[in-house]
Amino acid sequence: MFDILVYLFESYIHANACPASDQLARKLSAAGFEDEEINEALDWLAGLRRVAAETHPCVAPSRSAVRLYSDYECTRLSAACRGFLTFLEGAGVLDAVSRELIVERAVALSNFTITLGRLKVIVLMVLWQREQPVDTLIIDELLSSDDDEGAPLLH
């Protein structure tokens, strides 16, 4: 599923440039992806679109505010993942709304262990969906793999 998400990022400049789900599924199948992975990715993307559309901008929290994670979020997101989100927010890459979308979409992946590499793909996809400008160095970092899975995610 994560390979499909990276493929979409590389193939479409913005989420709005993606074709409709049925046409996208055919394109992904023609590109060699498995039907099960395609369905997982499309379901996850539909959830991202739904949550992003429902999310209303909030009053920006104070720069000194700290996000406290629930016990369940802590079981789903390792200290490294939570630290990475804090780093991105402190660096100005993420705002509070993006961070919350990332946490929600990561927790929604109950069938997957959320490694740092997978979290980076989730971050990339949330920024892509929200069409937020991202520095090239940040994109390189998000496409690099820190997991035991090895190779960079760039195709």
Curated annotation (Swiss-Prot):
It comes from the Bacteria. It holds the Pfam family DUF494. InterPro entries: Smg (IPR007456). Disulfide bonds: none annotated. Belongs to the Smg family. This is Protein Smg homolog. It comes from Azoarcus sp. (strain BH72).
